[in-house]
């Protein structure tokens, strides 16, 4: 099996999104997602009527507490100026595999020495990753997709179970607090 090592700058076009304010989102509602530095809701901060990007991309959070977070995007969307954008320009690279590989490596390159953590274009461009054949990249990405889905399902189920358990414990607490603090029950 042949392994090739590439710097991000050698396999991707690298850019950042544009400034899209909350006011712009409010005044231009539409169907196309706007991704920012947030990681909640998959990074989506709203939807607008226009679309800057179409196709398969990898995005990353450039600034803030979640700097270095990496996402695979496929479809029509927009990205703000605190969202870096990678467009694969090498036929040997599967974008989703790139996203998974970069997700592991990018956080190691975040600059925490600044007041606001950053992972800028120049730094990301120099990150080196190893790649196998595109066919194997696709298989690996499919396996990781399955694990990601199972993990999300399990998290949702556990969250629901824990919430239900917590509600029951709170009911018990109220019941026993009322009982134990009632002077009639102190006999």
Curated annotation (Swiss-Prot):
Record-linked InterPro entries: Restrct_endonuc_typeI_TRD (IPR000055), Restrct_endonuc_typeI_TRD_sf (IPR044946), Type-I_RS_S_subunit (IPR052021)
DNA-binding found in the keyword field:
yes
Keyword line = DNA-binding, Restriction system
Molecular function terms in GO for this entry? DNA binding
GO annotations under biological process? Answer: DNA restriction-modification system
A Pfam family found in this protein is: Methylase_S
Q: Please give the family membership noted in the entry.
A: Belongs to the type-I restriction system S methylase family.
Q: What does this protein do?
A: The N-terminal section of a specificity (S) subunit of a type I methyltransferase (MTase); this subunit dictates DNA sequence specificity. The single R subunit has multiple frameshifts and is probably not expressed.
Subunit structure and binding partners: The methyltransferase is composed of M and S polypeptides.
| Record remark: domains | Contains two DNA recognition domains, each specifying recognition of one of the two defined components of the target sequence.
- This chain's protein is named Putative type I specificity subunit S.MpnORF289P N-terminus
């Amino acid at each position: 099996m042949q392994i090739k090592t590439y710097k991000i700058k050698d396999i991707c076009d690298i850019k950042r999104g544009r400034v899209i304010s909350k006011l712009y989102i409010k005044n231009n509602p539409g169907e196309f997602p706007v991704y920012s530095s947030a990681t909640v809701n998959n990074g989506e901060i709203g939807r607008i009527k226009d679309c800057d990007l179409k196709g398969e991309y990898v995005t990353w959070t450039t600034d803030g507490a979640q700097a270095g977070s990496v996402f695979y995007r496929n479809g029509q969307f927009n990205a703000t100026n605190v969202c870096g954008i990678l467009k694969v320009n090498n036929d040997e690279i599967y974008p989703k595999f790139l996203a998974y590989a970069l997700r592991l490596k990018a956080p190691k390159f975040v600059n925490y020495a600044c007041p606001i953590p950053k992972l800028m274009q120049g730094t990301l461009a120099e990150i080196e990753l190893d790649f196998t054949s595109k066919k194997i990249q696709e298989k690996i990405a499919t396996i990781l997709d399955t694990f990601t889905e199972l993990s999300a399902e399990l998290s949702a189920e556990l969250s629901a179970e824990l919430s239900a358990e917590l509600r029951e414990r709170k009911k018990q607490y109220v019941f026993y607090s009322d009982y134990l603090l009632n002077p009639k029950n102190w006999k």
